[in-house]
Amino acid sequence: MAERTHACGKVTVEAVGQTVQLKGWVQKRRDLGGLIFIDLRDRTGIVQVVFNPETSKEALEVAETIRSEYVLHVEGTVVERGEGAINDNMATGRIEVQATKVNVLNAAKTTPIIIADDTDASEDVRLKYRYLDLRRPVMFNTFKMRHDVTKTIRNFLDTEEFLEVETPILTKSTPEGARDYLVPSRVHDGEFYALPQSPQLFKQLLMVGGFERYYQVARCFRDEDLRADRQPEFTQIDIEASFLTQEEILDMMERMMTKVMKDAKGVEISAPFPRMTYADAMARYGSDKPDTRFEMELTDLSEFAAGCGFKVFTSAVESGGQVKAINAKGAASKYSRKDIDALTEFVKVYGAKGLAWLKVEEDGLKGPIAKFFGEEDANVLMNTLEATAGDLLLFVADKKSVVADSLGALRLRLGKELELIDESKFNFLWVTDWPLLEYDEDADRYFAAHHPFTMPFREDVELLETAPEKARAQAYDLVLNGYELGGGSLRIYERDVQEKMFKALGFSQEEAQEQFGFLLEAFEYGTPPHGGIALGLDRLVMLLAGRTNLRDTIAFPKTASASCLLTEAPSPVAEAQLEELNLKLSLKEEK
């Protein structure tokens, strides 16, 4: 078999007159009665091959048997297309290859999906036949971008003198948040490894070990409820450094992301990135990962509501809640009563009891609650919300968390429905000054807002023992277009501070020692100040490639039920395998 001389998508007018050896898949076959045209595809693109009896009767006879997705080796001569046959939409659209020889390297059955960007296959079918789905150019281009992003990050961190170090996949189960994936040990009866939710503890131990600058393209595993932008196994760019301040870390990440955007996406972005405190983000956008590509911020009306004539508003404020609103500019005519009812049902998903609304008309406010506001209150309301005729005003009165969640989600929905979002924009944002702990009423205890190893502000360390809910974290999240790209922080590096943190989280001294004794001891041997960040590679690629589903950025992803339709994992195992592990199944009966 002759060696390939050209990739299909790289045959241009410079090759006219040359004999070329091409290898690839049949994208399309057209029989024009005496002439057969084949679009031959490889990962670089498509080239048109012509089978003409005047050039080679033998090649034409073989071409008559060829079908879509056959794998071919074609030898032929590159010629220019006639004036009327030029296709400027193709990189190879000014030439074609006159075939002199063709060899079928492999035949193909009729494929269950159309191998084209606009395939008609459902996602389940695409995942079952993932190896065919990956042939589509849009999929290859996504993974080419993933490669480019990873390469750029590696090159950047190399110039910054970071070492790439691998950390264990089989590790210890620790209570870090999501459920662990457990792996039974054959050697140690009744004991289990856990797959890492992140390399958090090991990267901190590398700082104890004096490596100073570490990174890893790390596989992480979390047994949690899935959604469109989550997978049970995912990849993060894990970065940690000693002796750097928060400002130095943020500056370095901005330089890295600027280079990624330029090299992998061809987009120039400016740094430094805007910054917003967690409290400000929640107050203005109802989200800790605000999409700043459009306006429509939340407005706090609690002070106004306390003295207005609408009991729903006043009672919410009196019970310690708040009233907030968003002004959908010019949207009054675009939303019927039925449409607003749909918005009401939407906010109920986030815990809201309802959605109050008003339309602004030339002669004043109209809507079911307009009667509760006199002229003076109506003017205050309109001035506060900067409302003019044609605007739609939407209100939620409830607990602060419910108001934020419901209006934050409603804002995003309206942004999409009203086409307010400029999809060409890439708005990076740092969200800083997070709360260190969050209180869970159901569990009646505090949980770490990020993780238990986040350093509080120095002046807040004592609050861990007196008022944990007031302690602030030296933490920062990088947000892009309303998605959390990654989170980081300065880390606790002193044993006494870490013990106070564990105590605030409800760990007894014995539990802390049992779970994290190795880390606490490490902190007694001269641990340097350190911090870092972990960026979600899958999510970053999803946003840069313009995909809407994280599964499109992972070669062989899982479904929403954490199963692989291609290999049918997870699957039962043989009884002998269980016996070898000294395990016995006790399955719950389905009701």
Curated annotation (Swiss-Prot):
Its EC number is 6.1.1.23. InterPro entries: Aa-tRNA-synt_II, aa-tRNA-synth_II, aa-tRNA-synth_II/BPL/LPL, Asp-tRNA-ligase_1, Asp-tRNA-ligase_1_N, Asp/Asn-tRNA-synth_IIb, AspRS_core, GAD-like_sf. The keyword Ligase applies. The record marks G84 as: Important for tRNA non-discrimination. Keywords: Aminoacyl-tRNA synthetase, ATP-binding, Cytoplasm, Ligase, Nucleotide-binding, Protein biosynthesis. Belongs to the class-II aminoacyl-tRNA synthetase family. Type 1 subfamily. NCBIfam families: aspS_bact, PRK00476.1. This is Aspartate--tRNA(Asp/Asn) ligase. It comes from Bacillus cereus (strain AH187). The gene is aspS.
